[in-house]
Curated annotation (Swiss-Prot):
Belongs to the class-IV pyridoxal-phosphate-dependent aminotransferase family. InterPro entries: Aminotrans_IV (IPR001544), Aminotrans_IV_CS (IPR018300), Aminotransferase-like (IPR036038), BCAT-like_C (IPR043132), BCAT-like_N (IPR043131), Class-IV_PLP-Dep_Aminotrnsfr (IPR050571), D_amino_transT (IPR005784). This is D-alanine aminotransferase. Substrate binds at residues 32, 99, 101. PROSITE patterns: AA_TRANSFER_CLASS_4. The keyword Transferase applies. The keyword Transferase applies. It comes from the Bacteria. Pfam families: Aminotran_4 (PF01063). Pyridoxal 5'-phosphate binds at residues 51, 178. The modification N6-(pyridoxal phosphate)lysine is found at residue 146. Its EC number is 2.6.1.21. The gene is dat. It comes from Staphylococcus epidermidis (strain ATCC 35984 / DSM 28319 / BCRC 17069 / CCUG 31568 / BM 3577 / RP62A). GO terms for molecular function: D-alanine-2-oxoglutarate aminotransferase activity; pyridoxal phosphate binding.
Length: 282
């Protein structure tokens, strides 16, 4: 029987219910995180929950949980559902209250919910690479908050699916920001380029891991803006996320990235990622 955490309890999946007035449902008023499990251990879980609590603070949401309590919560859920390889989705909303755009007065209790999913790693895609398309970034101006407001991302991802691509790489004007559900990197002349951390992108946890790996491997890592043209002229292109890991992009908008093969620096980062799974899972 699959268990779900909701409102402070671990309940059977069919008993996991929220109010129709929940502000996450009617406004998207909430935040979330997705954490990867490898061999029954949680990967970079502390970093995920640091970001979770930062997102909560940015939207004025007091969760009354410590990082340690959140880690124990998802660890128990992982064990309850016998998840060895997979992920844990956790979200928090501002709670249930009569529909009104302003925050409830007085505040109501936030609703925290979490569930698990078992799945294997995307071995074939990591080995061979995937295709991407580019599209205008139509999202709001606080992409640094991991908010439930994902309609812009959903539309971009559906656009990618329509053209048989794995990811939609978004750009504001000529400047590449990030993927619909990933960070984006252009590798040129031995240097890794990615958009700087600001309100236009989410500071991905896997992005941070890639930066750590680059430092360990002495690969230059530059956080600076680059154009779609620069992206398409890169020697290698990758995307990263909790689910996609270090994913090679071998074709963009129907054109090969160089010879259409996975590059040497990408392979170096993938190998480094394997080591980080071992050293940063608890």
């Amino acid at each position: 029987m699959t268990k779900v955490f909701i409102n402070g309890e671990f309940v059977n999946e069919e008993d996991a219910k929220v109010s129709y007035e929940d502000r996450g449902y009617v406004f998207g008023d909430g935040i979330y995180e997705y954490i990867r499990a490898y061999d029954g251990k949680l990967f970079t879980v502390k970093e995920h929950f640091e970001r979770f609590l930062r997102s909560a603070e940015e939207i004025g949401l007091d969760l009354n949980y410590t990082i340690e309590e959140l880690i124990e919560l998802v660890r128990r859920l992982l064990k309850e559902n016998n998840v060895v390889n997979g992920g844990i989705y956790i979200q928090a909303t501002r709670g249930a209250a009569p529909r009104n755009h302003s925050f409830p007065t007085p505040p109501v209790k936030p609703v925290i919910m979490a569930f698990t999913k078992s799945y294997d790693r995307p071995y074939e895609e990591l080995e061979q690479g995937v295709y991407a398309i580019t599209t205008e970034d139509i999202r709001w101006l606080r992409c640094d908050i991991k908010s439930l407001n994902l309609l812009g991302n959903v539309l971009a991802k559906e656009y990618a699916v329509k053209y048989n691509a794995a990811e939609a790489i978004q750009h504001r004007g000529d400047i590449v920001t990030e993927g619909a559900s990933s960070n984006v990197y252009a590798i040129k002349d031995g240097v890794i380029y990615t958009h700087p951390v600001n309100n236009f992108i989410l500071n991905g946890i896997t992005r941070r891991v890639i930066k750590w790996i680059a430092e360990d491997e002495q690969i230059p890592f530059k956080e600076e803006k680059f154009t779609v043209e620069f992206l398409k002229s890169a020697d290698e292109v990758i995307i990263s996320s909790t689910s996609a890991e270090v994913m090679p992009i071998t074709k963009i908008d129907g054109e090969n990235v160089q010879d259409g093969q996975v590059g040497t620096i990408t392979r170096q980062l993938q190998q480094g990622f394997e080591k980080y799974i071992q050293s940063h899972s608890i």
